[in-house]
């Protein structure tokens, strides 16, 4: 793979139509907005979608969501321990942090792209503060900003009901309170996010030109296989991806 030689800046423009692009769990899962009513989609949400797309495209991903995982590991520690090279490096008496980071970056695309903090206790089940542990931070070259809407967004909230009770009560014919709920959506929002790929950090993690091209393809199809009841098929759409490749490293 060829090393990344030129800095890359990018802008992703997308729309949300009758959808909840990113619910806020602290606000009843209403679409995120700032105090002015400008819609927001967090960088964490965007990176989650990018990871999912890269996983669909066959890339090895370290931070996999539980409902989209491609292996049998149920935690990050299990996944790290499942990498033979990484496990052997962690067992060494004299730990080489640079070697550990190099293996992790080589193994997982998202680690060499977004970075990762490996902070695991070595003695399983030990809560002792003095127990041996490993804490290695890796800075990734790819950064993405929170997406914001170009204008204020109108949020529509709809009362919904379930057709059946969750549990059988004393009176099976009586509707339980849990059959009532709320569903929120953005009528329409045009969102923009900006990001970049840093050459200096790419050299440290091994992020290559080929990796940059894969990132570009993942962003162009970021909403593929991302459909849910909150984001029905066709409700989230990429309008444009502007990809600036500089003629210098900075």
Q: Which functions belong to the PLM regions below?
A:
Residues 1-250:
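RNA-binding basic/glycine-rich loop and surface signature characteristic of RAMP-family CRISPR effectors
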């Amino acid at each position: 793979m060829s090393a990344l030689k030129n800095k890359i800046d990018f802008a992703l423009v997308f729309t949300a139509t009758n959808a909840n692009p990113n619910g806020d769990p602290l606000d009843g899962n209403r679409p995120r907005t700032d105090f002015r009513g400008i819609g927001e989609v967090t960088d964490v949400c965007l990176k989650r979608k990018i990871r999912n797309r890269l996983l669909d495209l066959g890339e090895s991903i370290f931070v996999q969501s539980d409902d989209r995982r491609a292996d049998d590991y149920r935690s990050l520690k299990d996944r790290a321990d499942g990498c033979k090279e990484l496990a052997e490096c962690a067992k060494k008496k004299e730990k080489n942090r640079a070697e550990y980071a190099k293996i992790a970056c080589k193994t997982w695309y998202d680690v060499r792209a977004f970075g990762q903090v490996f902070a695991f206790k070595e003695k399983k089940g030990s809560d002792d503060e003095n127990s041996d542990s490993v804490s290695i931070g890796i800075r990734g070259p790819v950064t993405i900003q929170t997406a914001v809407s170009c204008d204020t967004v109108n949020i529509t909230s709809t009362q919904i009901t379930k057709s059946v009770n969750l549990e059988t009560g004393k009176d099976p014919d009586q509707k339980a309170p849990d059959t009532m709920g709320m569903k929120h959506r953005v009528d329409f929002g045009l969102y923009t996010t900006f990001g970049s790929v840093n050459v200096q950090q790419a050299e440290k993690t091994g992020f290559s030109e080929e990796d940059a091209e894969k990132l570009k393809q993942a962003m162009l199809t970021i909403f593929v296989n991302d459909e849910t009841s909150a984001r029905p098929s066709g409700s989230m759409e990429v309008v444009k991806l502007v990809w600036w490749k500089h003629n210098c490293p900075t």
